[in-house]
Amino acid sequence: MDTRALAEEPEPGEVGPRATVNPRLFRRAPRATLAPDGEVTVRFAVTRAVPAASLYYGTEVPEDPFALARLRRVSSELSIEDGAHTLRFDLRRLLRAKYDVGRVLERGVGVLRWRVEALDPTHGTTRVHDGRTAFSCTPTPCTEDSELVQLPTVVLGPFVDRVDHESATLSFETDVPTAALVAARSEGGRVRQGRSPIGTWHEIRLTGLRSGVRYRYLPLVVDGRGRIAEGRSATFSTWPAPDEDTRLTFAVLSDSRSGLGTADEQYAGTNRQVLWDLMLGALREGARFTVFVGDLIDGYRSHAGAVRYELRAWQKAIEPVGASMPIYEAMGNHEALIEYWTPGWAIGAVSPTSMEALFAERFVNPDNGPTAAEGAPPYDENVYSFDAGPAHLAVINSNYFWRSHFWRDDHPAAGRGFGEGWVDDAQLEWLDADLAAARERGQRHLFVFTHEPGFPNGGHVSDGMWWEGRHPEMLAQRDRLFRLLARHGVAAIFHGDEHNYSRTRVHDGLVDGLERPLWQVISGGAGAPYYAQERGVPWASDVRAFDARQHFVLVEIDGDDARARVVSRTGETLDRFDLTDAR
């Protein structure tokens, strides 16, 4: 489905049948099995014809955690067996001294990295899927006569989230049900451990950590056969104690859905190539954490499995950085699991699951948001807040329970859902109390994040919270939000949605009754197709900066001072400004 159909106006009373939208290519994701003789078989099922596919593979280099997989050989002998597409290769071809970068022969264990690249003639492109498979040799050290054993594998992660001065949450996924343990230790410190019950998705909270200390951690998993394997080791730093935490650097970016070009720019709904460069750039710049303000994926799908697949691909894209730097995710309009009726009606699904519930299932964010009404999607982990040093950050959802054509009474879901850009009353009441409490705790710098811009500048002037001024109730709710921000002294609100960078001064000439000006910052340059500036908006003279280059925003706080620097994908500084002085 072309999402432009959702912007068309159906004829009055014109409601067609429900339809499936945007099925993914891989109906069953590629999965590898390893035979004792070293033969690896990768099988997958598809939703449409795949005339050709290749399988690239290599062993993991343990000393290179921030590098993308380096692949050494290829197999292209595609066959169809029992309805599944099948590719095979001999792992022993990699277990030769000249290829043994992972020292598998010596250690007796290794991790195989592999990629399926399938031709999708329907769309004239290729689709890729990346995997990993842990294995061991019996006996050790490996020889040509050793038996190869497939081990339980950490196939996604680990990720570090919800870090503070004394705790952190580690999460990861395994290919089979496992019990899991994470061990963490600082230099010269005690080992801290956390455990997770049997399952494939593990979230483990480590407590009793020391403040301002770097920890190295290691996931360990054991399957039902008693086979034990390690996940990837990584490091993270706890935050300084609140009374010592006066300096802070964090990054903001959004809109990494598919671009145009290579398979990695259309990586299961994500522009992996650009996203990876920007995330690594933020880490190099010293960001303690990142806030990602929505449109992670292409979305707009009618099957929960297709949305899960895209969210998982996004996690795969940020995986190496996410092992060491917490990433706080927000929902955008493309995070959409929908019910769809021709010729263009849609609403966010609620049963058997919702996009909001899937979001909480895949990500680890604070869960201190408002309580949803009965029968409505949850706010859990898509509306939340947290303190970081002298700052307080609040994330709200301007695409909560999204519905197309919200102004139409003949919508098949009339009376349910909200329009794109609407921040509902429950969120505004929660945000009001949350910001007031942050001020009472003495937090000096307040920031709010939501995907839809109040004052769009390039690409989304026909929606966002503006809708070209066509919907007075939307404008009134927008102004209510901005008055609330100003009343609490919020320094800036960060948005995405538009695939560019802009900085706009919002003042009482734009919002009646605004107590003080503040910055609106749009940072949507993480890989989605570009938009140019549109200068016909009423606030064009208040736009202080605009740039179409891919980028992230770096917020740097030192005591009472807070400044922002906009950094391009190539490391150039595109803009600098004082967050405490919106003029």
Model-derived segments and spans:
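Acidic, histidine-bearing metal-coordination/catalytic regions of metal-dependent phosphoesterases
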Residues: 1-264, 283-284, 443-446, 548, ...
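Active-site environment of divalent metal-dependent phosphoester hydrolases
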Residues: 143, 217-219, 258-262, 298-302, ...
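Extended active-site neighborhood of metal-dependent phosphoesterases/phosphodiesterases
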Residues: 159, 219-237, 305-440, 465-472, ...
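Active-site beta-strand/loop signature of hydrolases that rely on acidic residues for catalysis
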Residues: 172, 176, 286-297, 301, ...
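Internal alpha/beta domain cores that form substrate/cofactor-binding pockets in large enzymes
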Residues: 247, 251-254, 258-285, 292, ...
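Active-site neighborhood of phospho(di)ester-bond hydrolases with catalytic His/Asp-centered motifs
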Residues: 252-254, 289-295, 323-333, 396, ...
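Short acidic, glycine-rich surface-loop motifs adjacent to enzyme active sites
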Residues: 292-298, 438-462
